C-alpha cells in the first residue's frame, strides 16, 4: 500500500484545455454515461472468443484454470482499482482522477494489439480492470456529490443503461470479427475501447469539479460558485424541486461531517457496522444472481445445449439485447418506487429460475469429450434440444428480471442506506466487496462448470434465495427516508458530539446570531480551522 501511494503521489498534471463547463444535470449525466459504456465494452470482449477456434489455437487451448484467470483478471484489477481510488480520493480532484484514469485506459487499450501470450493478456486485462474499479467508485461518488438527490437514481440508471449498450455493441463486434479466421480479429476487438475513451477524455474537461472536494481543501469561494451554478441550472428546469444555494457556512458542514473521507486508517464510527453488512449483502445478491456468469459464459451454455456455428453466436447475443432493452424500464420508476420491493421482486424469482436450470442440467446432462477442445466443457445435453431450449429461455428470463430490478436498485439502495458520515467510505467498501465476489465467481466458474456441472446453478440459486430472504427480514425501506431517519434507524453515533474522526466537539458559526453554537462533549470543545482560498479562516 505504501509503494502504491508513492506511485500515485507522482502522477503528472493534466494538460489544460479550455472547454466551457456545463452545470446542467442532463449534460453531466450524458458525459458520465460514457463511463458506463466503457465499462460495458470490457464484459464480452474476451468471453465471445473463449470458444473461438482461432483464439484457442493461438493461445494453445487454455485450461479451465487459465480461462478462469483470464476472465477473473478484470474483477481482480477492479479490487485494486478500488484501493487506488481510496488513496487518490483526498489528494486528487474528481476530474483529475477521471482524466488520469482514462488516459491509462487508452494507452493499455492500444497495447492490447501487441499481445502475444496469455501473460500479456492477463496483465492488460488486470490494468484495465483497475481503471474500471476506480471508476465504479468514482462515478457513483461524483454523481452523489454533484447531482441533486431526486435525480441520482435516474442518473445511475442511465449509466447502467449505457453499460448494457456497451456490452451489446462489443458482443456484436466480436461476433462479426470472429468470422474472420485471423488473430487480428480479437486484437482489433480489444482496441475498440479507445474510441469512447478519447471521447470521454475530451468531455471530462466540461465537467464541473465536485464542490464537496473543494470544501475539504479550503477552496470555499470556488466551491460556492460551482454549487450556486448547479443549483441555478437545476432550479430553472425543476422549479418544484428547487435546490437551495448554500452559504460558505453550510458548505463547510461537509468538512466536520467527513462525508468524503476515504482514509481507512481512521476508525469507522459506532453504528457503521450494520449498514455496511447490509450494503455488502446487496453486492453479494448481485453476484450470486448469476448475471455475470450468464453474460460472461453464455457461449459455454450454448455449446452445452448443442448449438454450433453462427446459430451459437447469434443466440448468445440475445441476453445482451434483452439486458439493454429492459434496462430502459428502471429509468421510469427508480426515483418513485420502493427499493426493498424491487430488490425482492428480482431476487426471489431469479433464485427459483437458477435452481430450475440446475435441476434440468443435472437430470438431462451427460458426460462427453471436451467440446471443440475446450476442457471446461465436458458435459452436454445436445441430444435433448427441447430441454436445451427451455434452459436458454430460463437464462434469458433471468437476464430480463435482473435488468428490471437488480441492475440499478442495489446501487441506489446501498447509497441511501449508508449514514451520511460514512457514505463515501462505506460505498467504497461495498463496491470493493462486490468486485471481490465478482472475481471469485468469475475465476471459479470454468472449474465449477467442469467439476460440479449443473449443481453450479443450484448453488447460485440457493444462495440468492437466502440473501433475498435476509433482505425481506432485516433490510429497511429507504425510499422517502431522510438522512436523519437513516442515522436514527441504525443508531448511528447516537452519543452526542462524536464525529467521524473521533473528535469530541466542533464549534460552528451560527448564521442567526453573532455568537456560535457548540457541539460539546465530556472532553470539552474543539475549534477546527479551514484555510480559505482568500487566506481567511472559517472556524467550524
Swiss-Prot record:
* Cytoplasmic topology ranges: 1-29, 89-101, 148-158, 209-275, 335-341, 407-428, 477-540
**What domain of life?**
Eukaryota
Compartment annotation: Membrane
Gene3D superfamilies noted in UniProt: MFS general substrate transporter like domains
UniProt region (Disordered), positions on chain: 499-540
| Ranges of biased composition (kind: Polar residues) | 509-524
Q: Topological domain, Extracellular: which ranges?
A: 51-67, 123-126, 180-187, 297-313, 363-385, 450-455
Residues that carry a glycan: 52, 374
Q: How is this protein annotated for GO cellular component?
A: fungal-type vacuole; membrane; prospore membrane
Q: Work out whether the entry's keyword set contains Repeat.
A: yes
Bilayer topology: Multi-pass membrane protein
| Transmembrane feature ranges | 30-50, 68-88, 102-122, 127-147, 159-179, 188-208, 276-296, 314-334, 342-362, 386-406, 429-449, 456-476
Q: Name one GO molecular function term.
A: myo-inositol:proton symporter activity
**Which UniProt keyword terms apply here?**
Glycoprotein, Membrane, Repeat, Transmembrane, Transmembrane helix, Transport
What Pfam families is this protein classified in?
Sugar_tr (PF00083)
The UniProt similarity line reads: Belongs to the major facilitator superfamily. Sugar transporter (TC 2.A.1.1) family.
User: What is the name of this protein?
Assistant: Probable metabolite transport protein YFL040W
